[in-house]
From Swiss-Prot:
Monomer. Can also form homodimers and oligomers. Its cofactor is Mg(2+); Ni(2+). Comprises two domains: an N-terminal domain containing the nucleotidyltransferase activity and a C-terminal HD domain associated with both phosphodiesterase and phosphatase activities. The keyword tRNA processing applies. Magnesium is required for nucleotidyltransferase activity. Nickel for phosphatase activity. CTP binds at G8, R11, R91, R137, R140. It comes from Salmonella paratyphi C (strain RKS4594). The lineage of its organism: Bacteria, Pseudomonadati, Pseudomonadota, Gammaproteobacteria, Enterobacterales. This is Multifunctional CCA protein. HAMAP family: CCA_bact_type1, CCA_bact_type2. It catalyses: a tRNA precursor + 2 CTP + ATP = a tRNA with a 3' CCA end + 3 diphosphate; a tRNA with a 3' CCA end + 2 CTP + ATP = a tRNA with a 3' CCACCA end + 3 diphosphate. It holds the Pfam family HD. ATP binds at G8, R11, R91, R137, R140. Gene3D superfamilies: Beta Polymerase, domain 2, cca-adding enzyme, domain 2. GO terms for molecular function: ATP binding; CCA tRNA nucleotidyltransferase activity; cyclic-nucleotide phosphodiesterase activity; magnesium ion binding; phosphatase activity; tRNA binding.
Length: 413
């Protein structure tokens, strides 16, 4: 029995990155030998065991053979005669087909170290094309390592295009698509994930609402980048710089979906694109089974982001109604989230990346003023039932009006 550290832990150690999870491969052992050594079996489809002390995963070396459609259509063979090289060959990318033995020696039968040094994401073998989930995984790795200048090998991107054109991605379940997307959205450069999907044709299949934005023009005065799809990826990049929150990044991604519905004869203007985009956000989220809290914020951002941009001319009553509409009284975090997405929208434009966004500050300040109005005083003044809410709203409007006159007066006409 020989045990090897494999995959991501070896890869990240060679890149000088923190190693989070460790996966191990055991060569020359049977399931019974693992159980006798105190390991706990957890794998249902193939032999995977948990170490009795560390609880890290130890898998018996195995091979896989395509036996059906999609990413689940595989038959696994695990036995003591399966070699380490055979196990590594089933991996997706050469940089993940690395192993390290007890002496610290690197086993690299598929030249993963060479590709690490060349900053290349290259598939190990033609078997890559048998698993459509790998298209999304490669896109996610491209996003994860974009800051290290990794790129996808030409032959791998060509294979990804072939897989997409053959309809392989249609076998993916919504849950798997969302899981990969969720992980990609938390990387340093989530926009790269969607760009790669577009480059191989997968964006049109999996995210048609986003793909439809490419080629849709916006007024050059406000959007020097012109293309709404390009702007969408720029805003996502900016959102990733402004916030680590998945909610903020996803909402930013969806903020302009409504522009894809604008009739061509009305281009490049997109009046009413915010409210129009709400149903597309709902459609996308239902299809991919996006969590409700992410969906709800994305719908609010789609509907109200343009309103935030006009903050200096908003009436105090409109500002308080906005807080009502986003349910800020019960979910105060939404004020900050919407401020960040609106800022990402403004700064996600060519030449505006370093722009100040005072509207975000004003939104936060107005919220602090409005929520500081004490409910207790309204109740103690003798108001009852629905009168409490009406009086509280009046006092909040008055407080915001007083603040706005001093801190955010409307621009001179």
């Amino acid at each position: 029995m020989k045990i090897y550290l494999v995959g991501g832990a070896v890869r990240d150690a060679l890149l000088g990155l923190p190693v989070k999870d460790k996966d191990w491969v055991v060569v020359g052992a049977t399931p019974q030998e693992m159980l006798d050594a105190g390991y706990q079996q957890v794998g249902r489809d193939f032999p995977v065991f948990l170490h009795p002390q560390t609880h890290e995963e130890y898998a018996l070396a195995r091979t896989e053979r395509k036996s059906g459609s999609g990413y689940t259509g595989f038959t696994c063979y695990a036995a003591p005669d399966v070699t380490l090289e055979a196990d590594l060959q089933r991996r997706d990318l050469t940089i993940n087909a690395l192993a390290r033995d007890d002496d610290g020696q690197i086993i690299d039968p598929y030249h993963g170290r060479r590709d690490l040094e060349a900053r290349l994401l290259r598939h190990v073998s033609p078997a890559f094309g048998e698993d459509p989930l790998r298209v999304l995984r490669v896109a996610r790795f491209a996003a994860r390592y974009a800051h290290l200048s990794f790129r996808i090998a030409d032959e791998t991107l060509a294979l990804m295009r072939e897989m997409t054109a053959a309809g392989e991605l249609e076998h993916l379940t919504p849950e798997r698509v969302w899981k990969e997307t969720e992980n990609a959205l938390t990387t340093r450069n989530p926009q790269v994930y969607f760009q790669v999907l577009r480059d191989c044709g997968a964006l049109r299949v999996l995210f048609p609402e986003i793909d439809a934005l490419f080629g849709v023009p916006a007024p050059a005065k406000w959007h020097p980048e012109i293309d709404t799809g390009v702007h969408t990826l720029m805003t996502l990049s900016m959102a990733a710089m402004l916030s680590p929150q998945l909610d903020v990044r996803f909402a930013t991604l969806c903020h302009d979906l409504g522009k894809g519905l604008t009739p061509k004869n009305l281009w490049p203007r997109h009046h009413g694109h915010g409210p129009a985009g709400v149903k597309l956000v709902e459609q996308l989220c239902q299809r991919l089974r996006v969590p409700n809290d992410l969906r709800d914020l994305a719908k609010l951002v789609a509907e109200y982001h343009d309103l935030i941009h006009t903050f200096p001319i908003l009436q105090p009553k409109t500002i308080v109604k906005l807080f009502d509409a986003i349910d800020a009284w019960r979910k105060p975090q939404r004020v900050e989230q919407i401020a960040l997405t609106s800022e990402a929208d403004v700064r996600g434009r060519t030449g505006f990346e370093a722009s100040d966004y005072p509207q975000g500050r004003w939104l936060r300040e107005a919220w602090q003023v409005a929520q500081a109005v004490p409910t207790k005083e309204v109740v103690e003044a003798g108001f009852k039932g629905i009168e409490i809410r009406e009086e509280l709203t009046k006092r909040r409007i008055a407080a915001v009006a007083n603040w706005k006159e001093k801190r955010c007066p409307p621009p001179a006409s």
